[in-house]
């Protein structure tokens, strides 16, 4: 394909402009993209390092397992191998920055200046040569015009030959300049592309070596890694032997087995005794809902010796919900006979009414406790005479001592504060009339208490007469002796009641 000098000249100039207007700006963009690539790879290497550090930590956890120790070591080795490969990749990308990014940055600044100067020099020389050629051609035309109308033709002919030679030499010179300029421009362009290819080939060689090194390293370790996780349900022989020993233990106990403490053994004996009792006895009904009614005169029927056990029993009942095993341990520590059931004696009559889960009894009856623990003021026991079982208020009974007789004891004031303190002078043989207990009618009791408080405000100088010991008082419906002052007058006219604050879960506070 033949081209004229002007066409070649245009190709030369377009080549220079292509380098300056397309290649160099593209190179600048490539440098920016390469820097972003570097940042991404560095971030990937850091993230990979953190990831494989986590793999190593999990491997350390696995090494503590009796069946996964080998897998733990494999995880640690995988972590170290990949971190080593990441370090090698980091070194390769340092070369990428040094051999490509840094070199391109250095070349681009120099090349812009060089290409501008080269193109300008080419255009200037081409213009000068072209002007010289045109000037010689103009002189040749002038000589030819003069020689045509002149008589001395030989004189102009000699000059014409000289100008023709000059024009020819200058045409050859300018053509050679255009050809050399075009070649130089194309080579300059090629050198730049070649430089870019050469730098990336060098980096590719580093990456190739990195991949060969990685493949060699992974090929030497990967089969052994895969072998450790082929059978996930395989248990090491040592662990299997240990499991078999646990399945078939020897006849002699292990010397290092801890023995139970004596207190726990005694608590277990008590618990077994209660379990045996619950198995042999019929099914126990649930305790009534609500707290049992507490008689305000209960302490008057307790001996000093029995008042403390009663208070202890109330205290123990309040702490029952906290820890049953503790109360059983305390019962054992107090010396109670575990094999002997506790008995109580009734001090007030009690009527069950229509509730089949409650127990009815009269005053002075003996009840065997089937459950020695109170539940909200209720006890569960069996009547010694009727053999009936049921729940009853604990405040209607007192502990039965072995040497206690059936005689009525003298009521003594309780050492602990009671809800009301009477100033009536009661004789030793007289007894207080006890109203029929009915714990279900709390509202009627509250009204009766209000009426007694109103009657206490009236001023009366009545004093209860002492009953004669030689005359026996008749019994009322409750089984208690009828006092001689039941003549319709108020026996508690001189009683002054102190204001109290009653809390169902605590003793009254006297102000």
From Swiss-Prot:
UniProt-listed GO biological process terms: actin crosslink formation; actin filament bundle assembly; plasma membrane organization; positive regulation of actin filament polymerization; regulation of actin cytoskeleton organization
Stretch list, region Disordered: 302-328, 451-511
Taxonomic superkingdom: Eukaryota
Record Pfam families: IMD, SH3_9
Positions of the UniProt region annotated as Binds F-actin: 483-511
The keyword DNA-binding is assigned to this record: no
Residue(s) carrying Phosphoserine: 261, 281, 331, 354, 414, 420, 422
Classification via Gene3D superfamilies: Arfaptin homology (AH) domain/BAR domain, SH3 Domains
Compartments where located: Cytoplasm, Cytoskeleton
Chief place of localization: cytoplasm
Residue ranges annotated for the IMD domain, each copy included: 1-249
Signal peptide: none
Sites bearing Phosphothreonine, chain numbering: 248, 257, 412
SMART domains registered for this protein in UniProt: SH3
InterPro entries listed in its UniProt record: AH/BAR_dom_sf, Baiap2l1_I-BAR_dom, I-BAR_dom, IRSp53/IRTKS/Pinkbar, IRTKS_SH3, SH3-like_dom_sf, SH3_domain
Coiled coil: 115-154
SUBUNIT field: Interacts with RAC1. Binds to F-actin. Interacts with FASLG. Interacts (via SH3 domain) with E.coli effector protein EspF(U) (via PXXP motifs). Identified in a complex containing at least WASL, BAIAP2L1 and E.coli EspF(U). Interacts with E.coli intimin receptor Tir.
Description of its domains: The IMD domain is predicted to have a helical structure. It may induce actin bundling and filopodia formation.
Functional note: May function as adapter protein. Involved in the formation of clusters of actin bundles. Plays a role in the reorganization of the actin cytoskeleton in response to bacterial infection.
Protein name: BAR/IMD domain-containing adapter protein 2-like 1
């Amino acid at each position: 394909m033949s081209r004229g000098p002007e066409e070649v000249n245009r190709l030369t100039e377009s080549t220079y402009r292509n380098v300056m207007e397309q290649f160099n700006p593209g190179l600048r963009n490539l440098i920016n993209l390469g820097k972003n690539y570097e940042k991404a790879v560095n971030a990937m290497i850091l993230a990979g390092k953190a990831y494989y550090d986590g793999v190593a930590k999990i491997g350390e956890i696995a090494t503590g397992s009796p069946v996964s120790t080998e897998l733990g070591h494999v995880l640690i080795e995988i972590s170290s191998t990949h971190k080593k490969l990441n370090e090698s990749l980091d070194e390769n990308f340092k070369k990428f920055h040094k051999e490509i990014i840094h070199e391109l940055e250095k070349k681009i600044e120099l090349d812009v200046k060089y290409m501008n100067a080269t193109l300008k020099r080419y255009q200037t020389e081409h213009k000068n040569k072209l002007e010289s050629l045109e000037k010689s051609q103009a002189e040749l035309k002038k000589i030819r015009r003069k020689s045509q109308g002149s008589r001395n033709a030989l004189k102009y002919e000699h000059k014409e030959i000289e100008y023709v030679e000059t024009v020819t030499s200058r045409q050859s010179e300018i053509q050679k300049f255009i050809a050399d300029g075009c070649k130089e421009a194309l080579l300059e362009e090629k050198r730049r592309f070649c430089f870019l290819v050469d730098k990336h080939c060098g980096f590719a060689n580093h990456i190739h070596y990195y991949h060969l090194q990685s493949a060699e390293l992974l090929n030497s370790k990967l089969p052994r890694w895969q072998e450790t996780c082929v059978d996930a349900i395989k248990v090491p022989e040592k662990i299997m032997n240990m499991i078999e020993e646990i399945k078939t233990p020897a006849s002699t106990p292990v010397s290092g087995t801890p023995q139970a403490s004596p207190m726990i053994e005694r608590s277990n004996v008590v618990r077994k005794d209660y379990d045996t009792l619950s198995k042999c006895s019929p099914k126990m009904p649930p305790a009534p809902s609500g707290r049992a009614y507490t008689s305000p005169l209960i302490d008057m029927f307790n001996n000093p010796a029995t008042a403390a056990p009663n208070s202890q029993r109330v205290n123990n009942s309040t702490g029952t919900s906290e820890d049953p095993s503790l109360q059983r341990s305390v019962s054992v520590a107090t010396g109670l006979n575990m094999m002997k059931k506790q008995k109580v004696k009734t001090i007030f009559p009690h009527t069950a009414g229509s509730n089949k889960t409650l127990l009815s009894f009269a005053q002075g009856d003996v009840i065997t406790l089937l459950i020695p623990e109170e539940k909200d003021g209720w006890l569960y026991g069996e009547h010694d005479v009727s053999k009936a079982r049921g729940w009853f208020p604990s405040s209607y009974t007192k502990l039965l001592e072995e040497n206690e007789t059936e005689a009525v004891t003298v009521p003594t004031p309780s050492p602990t504060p009671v809800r009301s303190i009477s100033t009536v002078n009661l004789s030793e043989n007289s007894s207080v009339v006890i109203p029929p207990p009915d714990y279900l009618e709390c509202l009627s009791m509250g009204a009766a208490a209000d009426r007694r408080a109103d009657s206490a405000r009236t001023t009366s100088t009545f004093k209860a007469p002492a009953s004669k010991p030689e005359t026996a008082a008749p019994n009322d419906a409750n089984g208690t002796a009828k006092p001689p002052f039941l003549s319709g007058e108020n026996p508690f006219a001189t009683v002054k009641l102190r204001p109290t604050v009653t809390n169902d879960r605590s003793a009254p506070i006297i102000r």
